[in-house]
Structure formats: structure tokens, C-alpha cells
Amino acid sequence: MKLILSSLAQKKEGKAELALIFRTLRKHLLYVFGFSCWVNLLMLTGPIFMLQVYERVLSSRSEQTLLVLFSLVVALYAIMGSLDYIRGQVMARVGALFQDRLSDRAFNAALAGAVSPEGKRAPAAALRDLDSIQAALAGPGCLAILDLPWLPIYLIIIYLFHPWLGILATAAAILLIIVALLGELTTKKKQQAALQADGGSRIVENTVWRDAEAVLALGMRQNFAKLWRNKKQEAQKARLDHNGLSGKFRTTAKSLRLLLQSAMLALGALLVLKTEITPGVMIAASIIMGRALAPVDQLTGSYSALQNARSALHDLEILFGSMPAEESKPLLPRPNGLITVSKLAVGPPETRDPLVRGLEFSIRPGEALGIIGPSGSGKSSLARTLAGIWKP
């Protein structure tokens, strides 16, 4: 129970540290939110243009009206494209700033974790976590999340066209959201399995590269090659399973969206035949529904990146909580070369019983001390303690 409470406290501390970093990026995120509002407003340019063409141009047969409307549409789409490009660049900047502000912290925490019993992951994993988060922040998934709040606004506009069109659009949105949620829940375990399998293959690779001389000298090359192939095959199979399952949901969501847009056109055509709406409203409603459902479709296609980022954030929370940032140390006077050890007790961090107990000695400048003893007697433990790697 005490271990669980300690783990929760560490995760809370790590989450608070990451939240502080995100607060420093709040200004950039507010800019992106503002750009997203304008982009989504300007997305209504196409439907409004369609309405005006059907309601004004075709009825009046005025070429001048058509020219003015089209010129206005060109200008509005140019503005929308520029704003969409800018918000994408700002999000890419947010990802770069996030990594830049945490790179040193992650590097130091991973390095400390490499020599600590609490460091359960490979040091390079923390740096890969930063890459995953940066890729997600700069990817289309985050922009789709910012566009998602406009879904009910688009649905209200469709309701204003005709209640039946609004009901169909709402049902379509609910259906696609259910598919997206099912896909996220179903592929989550597959994603975790793929990440674990990939991590297992990396552990073998790191072991071989680190101890390459011993592997070659002891004739273990074939055994390690076989082990590495097996791990890579497991990782590849896990990735294929995950990609296959997420691909099914992506294809299902895309096909459903196209089908529902066609259903909107069919219902609109029926209402036109009953003279309840005009052809312009029929086309405009179909375009608006396509825009309303686009973020859900994009989120379905961004499963992997968003899941990787969420897993990376979770791992960084644990890492930062278990490896607090080092406090700035005051400047100390230059050492005079005297080393004094008094009643030292030390051993590997993961053990309770120290290898070295009650050790005392003193070395003055110019003196040398030789330490001899059998394997496992604590020579390396003493050296690590004197170097500050292990704590007594």
C-alpha cells in the first residue's frame, strides 16, 4: 500500500511539472485556438457561396453578381488557407518549444534513472518520448481536436436549414463518434503490446552494441542474432496487428462519412421535391455536414500518434516524479585534495545489505591508496560512492 501511495505521489509531482511547461506555452496555444476559430468560420464560405449561386445568380442570371461573389470567395479562401497554414506552423513551434524546454530535464532524469533502482526503462526511452509528443503536437490530430468543438455549431446551422437535415447530421455525428471511441478503446491494448515488443527488441540491440567485444569473443553472435530476430518478428507482428485493427476503423469511419454525406444529399433531394427547401440548401447542408464530421474522421486516422503521445506523457510523469530536478548547488571552495571516509556503509541501490561497512580511511594530497579484494567485496561500490554515483 505504501508503495502504491508513493508511486501516485511521484506521478502527481511529474504531472505538475509537465503542466507547468504547458502553461508556459499557453500564449501559443491561445493563438492557435484563435486561428482555429477563424478557419472554421471561413469554412462556411463554400456553403454560403452555393446558397448565393442558387438563390441569386441562377434566378437573376446576373454575370456581374457571379463575378463579385466568386472574387469574394477567392479572397476568403486565400485568407482561410493562410490562417490554416499559420496555425499549423504555430503548433509545430509549440512541439519544438516543448521538446526544447524539456530536453535537458529528460536527459538528466534518464541519466539519473540509469543508475537508480527506480529507473526501469532504457535512458533513451525518455528522449523518444519527447519525440513522440512533439510529433503529435505538430500533427493533424491536435488540430482536429481544436476543430471538434465546432461540430455542434455546424449541426445547429444544419438544423436551421431544416429539422430533418439536422436530425440526420446529428445521428451521423453520433455514429462516427461511437466508431472513433470504439476504435480508440479497441486499439489501445494492441498499441501497448506493439510498444512493449518494440522495446524488447531495442533492449537486445543495446545489449549487443554495449557488449559487442564479449559477444564476439565468447562466440555468442549467432545466439544473439537469433534472439534479436525473434524479438524483431514479435515487434513486427504486434505492429501489423495494431495497424490492421486501426486500419479497419479508419476505413469504416471514412466509408461511413461518405455514405452519410450521400444520405444527406438524398434526404435533401427528397425535401427539394417536396418544395420544403431549395437546391442551394441541399448542397450547402451536405458540405457543412462533411466539414462537421471531418475532425472525427481525422482523429480516427491519428490513433497511433495520439496514443503514443499519451503513453509518452504518462512515462515522463513517472520519470520526472521519481527523478526530481536537481537543485542548484552553491559554489564551494576549491577542494584541497584531502579525502576522508568515516564509517562508510554502501552497497548496490537495489539491495538492503551493504557490501562495505564501517570503512574508514584518509588520503592526503600526494598520497596513494591501493584497494584489493576478491570479486564482489565492494571495490566498485566504493569507487561509485566516492564519485557520487551511489549514495552511502
Over which residues does each language-model region extend?
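Juxtamembrane loop-to-helix connectors within ABC transporter transmembrane domains
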Residues: 50, 108-153
